A protein has these predicted regions:
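Short acidic/polar inter-strand loop motif in beta-rich domains
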Residues: 107-115
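Signal that preferentially marks extracellular ectodomain short beta-strand elements
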Residues: 71-101
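Short linear sequence elements within intrinsically disordered, low-complexity coil regions
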Residues: 18, 53, 64, 107, ...
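Extracellular recognition modules
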Residues: 103-105
């Protein structure tokens, strides 16, 4: 028995095949503990937020079309291309504090669910992942 495929179904199948071949820019991220960086596995990082305790800090990176795939957590303002007009007040640097818990959220892609990554710093300042999404 042969199935009849109408034009709409054929178009849908072609779109799905093209979408799977090209891929999409998602918000999937992981953490590189040695280099203290957040790495985007899919797409670029443009907008992100870091939550520390009950305070959220929002960041926007410079660029028109392409941005960076990593965010250096050692000093976010000085080691990344942060948009100057998007700084918080007179804050010149943003560094991670020892013995603190953080949530990094990639909010770059509008139609994708924001991806969050939880990590903490120990007393020496080393990073540790709380949800085991570590880059290899």
């Amino acid at each position: 028995m042969m199935m009849k495929i109408n034009n709409y179904e054929l178009f849908l199948y072609l779109v799905m095949i093209a979408y799977s071949m090209v891929g999409c820019a998602g918000n999937s991220i992981c953490i590189n503990l040695n280099e203290k960086k957040i790495v985007s596995k899919e797409g670029d990082i443009v907008r992100f937020e870091i939550e520390e305790n009950d305070t959220s800090y929002y960041f926007l990176l410079k660029g028109k079309v392409r941005h960076q795939k990593t965010v250096d957590l050692k000093d976010i303002y000085n080691n990344n291309r942060v948009d100057e007009s998007f700084r918080f007040g007179k804050m010149n640097s943003f560094s991670l504090k020892p013995r603190s818990t953080y949530i990094f959220t990639n909010r770059t892609v509008y139609d994708a669910t924001p991806a969050s990554l939880k990590f903490y710093t120990d007393s020496v300042g080393n990073l540790h992942s709380l949800d085991n999404r570590i880059c290899e």
